[in-house]
Amino acid sequence: MTRMKYLVAAATLSLFLAGCSGSKEEVPDNPPNEIYATAQQKLQDGNWRQAITQLEALDNRYPFGPYSQQVQLDLIYAYYKNADLPLAQAAIDRFIRLNPTHPNIDYVMYMRGLTNMALDDSALQGFFGVDRSDRDPQHARAAFSDFSKLVRGYPNSQYTTDATKRLVFLKDRLAKYEYSVAEYYTERGAWVAVVNRVEGMLRDYPDTQATRDALPLMENAYRQMQMNAQAEKVAKIIAANSSNT
C-alpha cells in the first residue's frame, strides 16, 4: 500500500513538472519586427511551440500592427503543425471572419480542410492498426465540404490539386462508414434502413469500392422483403460491375 502511494505521488509530481516545463516562455518587449523575425526563424527550424509563443505575443501586443494578418496566417500553420487542432480551427474561423476577401483565403480554406482531416484521424488507433471506418465521420464530412468549396471556388489555386486528391480519400472514408452502418442494419434485420442507406451511397459515393461492396446488402434486403423485382435489378448491377473489373 505504501509503495502504491509512493508511485501515485511520483506520477503526480512528474505531471506537475511536465506542466511547468511546458509553460510559455516570456517574450522580451522587443520591436515587432524583431519578434516577427524570431518567430520566422522558429518556424523554419520546425520549433512550433516557440514559434507559437512569439506569434501569440505579437498578436496580443500588436493586433492591428503591420504584421497582424501574416501573424494570424503563421499561427494557423504553427497550431496545425504542433497538433493544437482546436486552436488552429479557432484561428482559421477568426481569420475568415475578419478577412473574407484576403488574397490568401484559399490557403486558409485549405488549412481548414487539413485541420478537419487531422481531427478525423486518431494517432492511437492508427498506431495499433485499428480500422476507423465505423467511427462518426463528423470531421471527415467537414473536411470534404472544405475541400469541395476550395475546388469549386478557387479552381486555379495552387492548393486545388492536392485538395482534389484528398477529396478522393475522404469520399472513400465516408463511403466505408456508410457501409459499416448498412452492415449494422443488416445484422439487425432492418431491411428498409439497409436499402435507404445503400441508396444514399449510390447517390453520394457511386464510384467507391465500398458502394460496390454494399450492393449485395441491398439485394439481400430486397429479397428479405419479398421485393424480388428490385432485387433482380440490383443483381444485374452487381454482375455488370463484376464483368468490368
Curated annotation (Swiss-Prot):
Description of the deletion phenotype: Depletion decreases the density of outer membrane proteins, but does not significantly affect transport of lipopolysaccharides to the outer membrane.
Membrane topology of the entry: Lipid-anchor
Signal sequence, renumbered to the chain: 1-19
Keyword Transit peptide included in the entry's annotation: no
Main localisation: membrane
Keywords of the record: Cell outer membrane, Lipoprotein, Membrane, Palmitate, Signal
Compartments it resides in: Cell outer membrane
Coiled coil: none
Similarity annotation: Belongs to the BamD family.
Subunit structure: Part of the Bam complex, which is composed of the outer membrane protein BamA, and four lipoproteins BamB, BamC, BamD and BamE. Forms a subcomplex with BamC and BamE. Interacts directly with BamA. The Bam complex has the shape of a hat, with the BamA beta-barrel crown in the outer membrane and the periplasmic brim formed by the BamA POTRA domains and the 4 lipoproteins.
Protein name: Outer membrane protein assembly factor BamD
Originating organism: Escherichia coli (strain K12)
Origin organism lineage: Bacteria, Pseudomonadati, Pseudomonadota, Gammaproteobacteria, Enterobacterales
